[in-house]
């Protein structure tokens, strides 16, 4: 039996935290007070062969940063608050064309905006006004699109393939971002599963970039294998060629306050890695009421040009992102 028709649901969560002063005194708090609201709504339609839905998630967060005044003017204080709004839209659909062919499509858009609001106050009179100091008022905004489509095709009982295409686009702007940069790529991927015998399963895969705003490898391969050694013991071995391009934040975002001085590095290169994992699982006990399994696993990772945060070699006490050779 499969239910058909429209469906709707939603949720609301409110988190309030008064902060924690810790070893600080006066108005200052080690953990800043926070007021956070999370809302979501979803509606869609489904029947035996199709499921289509849209979902909206909304975050409204206020982090308050009260400070003490100076020793000479304790009544004059400067407070810094962080106001964040984030909208995430998701549209997804699944179609079952027949017993051997399924199609999946997804589209997502996120709009993130964070405002830094600095206010000056006179505690003796209650007067309050916005600070006019440099960089005291700031808005940072990120927008991101992700579109993805895949096909699951069961060609035979022992063989299936999953081709797909994915597009990603991200843009940032604000007083702490150098210009209005964007990063985008269009990639094609293909994975398969082959079970020539009951005791062996092979899952090869490859991803290639058709268009990219950065240097990308021609192909990113991976392979997963599973060996059924006995009725109660499995061996899994896998290899994956890792690739990660630098994010907008790592490339262009600058963040400076009393505790941090971090600058982006537009000269970053993508990082690469070779990743090997293996595990042996043994089912010690398997009954209707009790399942007991023990697993021994290991891994080996070899990174090249790994992106890491380190001290700026040109400016003391400042940090930036660098590629570590190995």
Feature map (PLM): residue ranges:
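Residues on the lipid-exposed face of transmembrane beta-strands in outer-membrane beta-barrel proteins
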Residues: 1, 41-45, 91-95, 147-153, ...
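Outer-membrane beta-barrel signature, preferentially recognizing the C-terminal barrel domain
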Residues: 77-92, 96, 140, 214-215, ...
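Repeated loop/turn-to-beta-strand initiation elements of outer-membrane beta-barrel proteins
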Residues: 3-6, 49-54, 62, 99-103, ...
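Surface-exposed extracellular loop regions of Gram-negative outer-membrane beta-barrel proteins
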Residues: 3-20, 59-66, 107, 111, ...
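Membrane-embedded beta-strand positions of outer-membrane beta-barrel proteins
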Residues: 8-10, 41-43, 54-56, 105-107, ...
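Flexible loop and strand-edge segments within Gram-negative outer membrane beta-barrel domains
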Residues: 15-103, 111-143
């Amino acid at each position: 039996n499969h239910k058909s028709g429209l469906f709707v649901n939603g949720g609301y969560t409110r988190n309030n935290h008064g902060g924690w002063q810790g070893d600080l005194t006066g108005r200052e708090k080690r953990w800043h007070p926070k007021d956070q609201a999370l809302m979501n709504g979803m509606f869609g339609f489904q029947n035996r062969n199709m499921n289509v839905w849209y979902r909206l998630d909304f975050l409204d967060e206020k982090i308050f940063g009260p400070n003490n005044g100076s020793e000479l003017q304790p009544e004059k204080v400067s407070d810094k608050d962080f106001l964040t709004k984030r909208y995430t839209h998701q549209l997804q659909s699944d179609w079952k064309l027949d017993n051997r062919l399924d199609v999946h499509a997804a589209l997502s858009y996120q709009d993130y905006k964070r405002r830094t609001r600095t206010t000056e106050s006179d505690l003796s009179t209650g007067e309050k006004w916005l600070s006019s100091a440099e960089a005291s008022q700031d808005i940072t905004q990120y927008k991101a699109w992700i579109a993805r489509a895949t096909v699951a095709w069961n060609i035979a009982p022992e063989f299936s393939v999953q081709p797909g295409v994915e597009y990603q686009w991200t843009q940032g702007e604000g007083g702490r971002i150098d210009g209005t940069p964007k990063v985008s790529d269009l990639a094609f991927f293909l994975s398969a599963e082959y079970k020539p015998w009951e005791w062996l399963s092979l899952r090869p895969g490859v991803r290639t970039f058709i268009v990219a705003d950065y240097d990308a490898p021609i192909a990113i391969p991976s392979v997963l294998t599973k060996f059924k050694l006995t009725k109660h013991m499995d061996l899994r071995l896998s290899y994956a060629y890792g690739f990660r391009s630098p994010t907008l934040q790592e490339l262009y975002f600058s963040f400076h306050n009393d505790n941090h001085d971090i600058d982006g590095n537009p000269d970053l290169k993508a990082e690469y890695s070779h990743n090997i994992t293996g595990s042996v699982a043994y089912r010690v006990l398997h009954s209707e009421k009790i399942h007991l399994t023990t697993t021994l696993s290991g891994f080996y990772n070899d990174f090249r040009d790994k992106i890491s945060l380190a001290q700026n070699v040109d400016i003391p006490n400042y940090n930036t992102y660098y590629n570590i050779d190995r």
